Amino acid sequence: MEWQQLLSRKRLGKQQLEEHQFERTSFLKDYDRIVYSTAFRRLKDKTQVFPLSKNADVRTRLIHSLEVSCVGRSLGRMVGDQIIKRHQLQAIEAADFGDILSAACLAHDIGNPPFGHAGEDAIQTAFQKWYARKNRSGALINPLEKADFDRFEGNAQGFRILTRLGLPHRPGGLQLTCATLATFAKYPRESFIPQRTLARHPGKSLQKYGFFQAEKDLFTEVAETVGLIGRSPKVAWWCRHPLTFLMEAADDLCYSIVDLEDGFHMGYLPFAAVQDKLQSIADIDLNQYEGSPAETIKRLRAKAINRLVKEVAQLFLDHEPDILAGKFDQSLVELSRFSPQLKEIETMTTNAVFHHPNVVRIKIAGFEVLGDLLTDFLTSVLEKQPRPKGKLLKFMLPPEHQIAPDEDNYSKILKVTDYIAGMTDLQATLLYQQLRGISL
């Protein structure tokens, strides 16, 4: 892969390359388009760790995305300066690397359904149960299409939002640059790849998938524009864009550190334990500082992230030749010398925060909410003779999700998952309560 091509300013859905503006580059415009999108605004009421939390100090998906974007920008500028010198790149600034990463990081969770990963699991499980029950008489959709829903993936939904749903009547949706879209694609493959094929190619980028069958052609255009290395001539499957490794690292180090801080703010983790874990990375002289426990944790969090950013940037530069050749497919954070400390943090956070009864209880409720909503709407739009409730449910779909008489089954299911996954935690909860007569 070549950096000059990897940083393509071409916009998906546009034939002409837009004129370069130094004061507001194409990649800065990408960032702005994401910020002003409806899907991004909805992240303010989507779960990061604590569903439906009333504590203003803990993070929602929106705040998490903004923080990851800041870290991504720093990583991009740090490595960009060195890469430009190393490859003698022309007409490219270090800020371009930072701006691409900032935009991609900002959008990295934009496709997540309500209730976080529990929401993804709920959609997968509900679809599989519904399909097994309703499909005894024959195939509703083909195996490639079915895999999109069997393994419903927020990353693929995110690519669909950016390239189609964000502005559905315009080719390319938000019409972001191919560089930003390729960087966004953490898992640059389709959902249906034989397990025996995947088993021969272990790596981080293969653990999930990054686009639905509906957007396969769009992703192919992005991949070919920026020059991603194809992994197989038989399936839609590429090596990652190099900057994707930095986007992943920005996300990994942010949630590792800030989930710890949020656990402290919620009262699930004691001050001494959180201070000890953060200090193992930050390594500062705490005797030089005064302040409350909350201020101490805030200072340690900032110092820890700063050290991790510098470490990850250097690791990327060390592995850059293999990354460009498509020979590297590991987590930069896991290669860090701080990996043991981060694993200890993950274990403590998982046990004390993610498994806390208050968190688990709401996640279970969210699982039921999304699963039942998906089942209700799928039955409504796909049954030939739905029951009276099913007939009425069709009118609950917003205009952009209304089903046309001539649409195929795959498109109908996509419109339902678009609607359900696009809700906020509160929207899904209220709709569930209303449809069951719990509240009106």
Curated annotation (Swiss-Prot):
- Look up keyword Hydrolase and say if it applies: yes
One of its Pfam families is: HD_assoc
What Gene3D superfamilies does its record include? Answer: eoxyguanosinetriphosphate triphosphohydrolase domain-like, Hypothetical protein af1432, putative deoxyguanosinetriphosphate triphosphohydrolase like domain
Alphabetic keyword roster: Hydrolase
Native organism: Synechocystis sp. (strain ATCC 27184 / PCC 6803 / Kazusa)
Boundaries of each HD domain copy?
61-256
Which family does the UniProt entry place this protein in? Answer: Belongs to the dGTPase family. Type 3 subfamily.
In the record, what terms sit under GO molecular function? Answer: dGTPase activity
Biological process annotations from GO: dGTP catabolic process
This chain belongs to the protein called: Deoxyguanosinetriphosphate triphosphohydrolase-like protein
Reading the lineage from the top rank, the first entry is Bacteria
Cross-referenced NCBIfam families:
dGTP_triPase (TIGR01353), PRK01096.1 (NF002205)
